[in-house]
């Protein structure tokens, strides 16, 4: 198995995210960080008699003490036997910033590599064979510029990964299921999922993931928790990435542009879906029935029709569903929620399909035509024997 890099297992919370964790999640977090601090101790780090949560909430002090500690020729019981040496303070360009950095640490140390900080506040303890053990990167230049959207990167691999978001290139393929990824770390995470060896197992469905952050995110698919709220329309989201994409619907930002037709999109996933309208690609094929799918998620839900798995269960009536989307649709039958509203008459609907059908009454659009009499309607009668006589004309 490939060595685990720090960025693949980093536990990294912002203050806002930390405030959203409940007691059980913080307890799990402390257990993970305890193991991390033990690893730090094994390479010479000294801790005062303070609790773990306090240590993590004060990373700047730990950051400084780590620099000033005696880390002389640390040799890990590792794969390469590299020697780590301490750098004098005068060789460190250390400047404190006002904003507290976040901490990143590695569960599985490979030659003792440890990272503390975020992208703008990052120090690595590296074995450079007798040279720099600490490399401070706060004010390092970012020579790699991405124009779509405008972002700068310090390292070329990060820049290449960002480029693949726009080009759709996914050079790393999983041998188990064929799913492709833009980075090698994606493959490692996928292999953990297939092997079931991840240290964090979901108590609802048994799915294993390799790091705490992904575990907490996955848990929300079962609990329905939505901690990210849009300030403009008060809509809530389970994931920060979904929240950011939604915000672009208000700002009008569309950073992903198709090079073939010039159409732009709010999200990378929408852009990738659009690209397949040009290529016709359906890379996910069911081994049991041969049906192909454009999306891995659709493929996984389809597989459940063969296995009979229904992981999403309604707490009110115990009815189970194959997909979370179907579960949400069913949930509205209990709550009476109607989130889809017509912009013209303000009438609300439970499902988006009902809204689209209603909107045709305003536009006079009638895409269905009777084969026998030629009469046009805005929608077909799906529950009548006459359904077979209607065909879609648009």
From Swiss-Prot:
GO terms for biological process: regulation of transcription by RNA polymerase II. Keywords: DNA-binding, Metal-binding, Nucleus, Repeat, Transcription, Transcription regulation, Zinc, Zinc-finger. It is found in: Nucleus. One of its GO terms (cellular component) is nucleus. It comes from the Eukaryota. GO terms for molecular function: DNA-binding transcription factor activity; RNA polymerase II cis-regulatory region sequence-specific DNA binding; zinc ion binding. A zinc finger (C2H2-type) spans 144-166, 172-194, 200-222, 228-250, 256-278, 284-306, 312-334, 340-362. CDD domains: KRAB_A-box. Transmembrane segments: none annotated. Residues 4-86 form the KRAB domain. Gene3D superfamilies: 6.10.140.140, Classic Zinc Finger. May be involved in transcriptional regulation. PANTHER family: ZINC FINGER AND BTB DOMAIN-CONTAINING, ZINC FINGER PROTEIN 709-LIKE. Belongs to the krueppel C2H2-type zinc-finger protein family. This is Zinc finger protein 763.
């Amino acid at each position: 198995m490939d060595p685990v890099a720090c960025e693949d297992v980093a536990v990294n919370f912002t203050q806002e995210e930390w405030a959203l964790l409940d007691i059980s999640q913080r307890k799990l977090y402390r257990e993970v960080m305890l193991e991390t601090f033990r690893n730090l101790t094994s390479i010479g780090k000294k801790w005062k008699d303070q609790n773990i949560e306090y240590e993590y909430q004060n990373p700047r002090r730990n950051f400084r003490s780590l620099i000033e500690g005696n880390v002389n020729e640390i040799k890990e019981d590792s794969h390469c036997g590299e020697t780590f040496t301490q750098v004098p303070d005068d060789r460190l360009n250390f400047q404190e910033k006002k904003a507290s950095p976040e901490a990143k640490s590695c569960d599985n140390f490979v030659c003792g590599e440890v990272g503390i900080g975020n992208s703008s506040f990052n120090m690595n303890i590296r074995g450079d064979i007798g040279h720099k053990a600490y490399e401070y990167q706060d004010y390092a230049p970012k020579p790699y510029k991405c124009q779509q959207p405008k972002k700068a990167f310090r390292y070329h691999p990060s820049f290449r990964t960002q480029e693949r978001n726009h080009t759709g290139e996914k050079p790393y393929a999983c041998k188990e299921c064929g799913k492709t990824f833009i980075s090698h770390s994606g493959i490692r995470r996928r292999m953990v999922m297939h092997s079931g060896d991840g240290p964090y197992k979901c108590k609802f469905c048994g799915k294993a993931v390799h790091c705490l952050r992904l575990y907490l995110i996955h848990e929300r698919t079962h609990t329905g928790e939505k901690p990210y709220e849009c300030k403009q329309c008060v809509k809530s989201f389970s994931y920060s990435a979904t929240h950011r994409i939604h915000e672009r619907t208000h700002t009008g930002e569309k950073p992903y542009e198709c090079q073939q037709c010039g159409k732009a999109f709010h999200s990378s996933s929408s852009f990738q879906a659009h690209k397949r309208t040009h290529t016709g690609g359906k890379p996910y094929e069911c081994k049991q029935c041969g049906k192909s799918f454009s999306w891995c998620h659709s493929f996984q839900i389809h597989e459940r029709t063969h296995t009979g798995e229904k992981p999403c269960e309604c707490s009110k009536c115990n009815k189970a569903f194959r997909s979370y989307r179907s579960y949400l649709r069913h949930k509205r039958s209990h709550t009476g929620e109607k989130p889809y509203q017509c912009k013209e008459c303000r009438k609300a609907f439970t499902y988006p399909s009902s809204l689209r059908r209603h909107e045709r009454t305003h536009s006079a659009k009638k895409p269905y035509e009777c084969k026998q009499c030629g009469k046009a309607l805005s929608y077909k009668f799906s529950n009548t024997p006459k359904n077979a006589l209607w065909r879609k004309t648009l």
